[in-house]
Amino acid sequence: FVFNSGARYNPTTDTWTPMSTVNAPSKYAHSAVWTGTEMIVWGGINSLTPLTPTNIGAKYNPISDTWTIISLSNAPNSTAYHSAVWTGDAMIIHGGINNNTTKKYNPITDTWTTLTHSGVVRFLHSAIWTGNKMIVWGGTNSINSPIMGINTGGVYNATSNTWSTTTLVNAPTPRVSNSAVWTGSEMIIWGGMHEDVVNNTGARYNPTSNAWINTTATNSPSARSSHSSIWTGSEQIIWGGGDNNTSFNDGKKYNPISNGYLPAVNINMYLYSKN
């Protein structure tokens, strides 16, 4: 099934509020970013028989509980498993199945702008925004099974509209469906899958020095992919995900200063997005 429903969660009251489905697009394997006032969803798959990527997007306003379809003029090709980052004033869409473009969407003017592309086709990759650059890494360039990951990456400079490559020296092994967070000075890559084998390794990338440092595997979470990961301001929290047989309801906290892991409190919740 492909759904067009959702809900807003209030952590203060611990309550859920259903969202309007009027003009809400049905999809999965899409992207979503938060602008500060609205959520923008874009792309994804809107039909399972056959699998049909789309280039339809919409903006959701939680105050008015309304959806607004965004412009298709100069929009990226229909795609899924792409990446999206919010720059502070625009959403950048990169890659995806059948899409070798990089484009920027301005929600104020409802317009798309074509950006320079990295020249590397990739999907099921990760992407982060540093404040002035977008770093994309990993993923795959083939839909063949088992999925073979890549361990290349690119750094997009929004000011100069140019790309540079991330070094392969000490880079993590090839993978798809890994997590990535930005610490303020480094991107931390962790987990993922390559040829149906999940892993529990990671690395920190410094875009200033273009250098990788491997993160410890001691006491790390069990090998997994399609998990969630956030940066708290001092630690990376890894949660959920799964391997080929099991979904997980556990996680750990990683401290880059000590290069160590600590347990995260368990909850009775399995969070796993199987790609």
Label every model-predicted segment.
Residues 1-275:
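Kelch-like beta-propeller repeat domains
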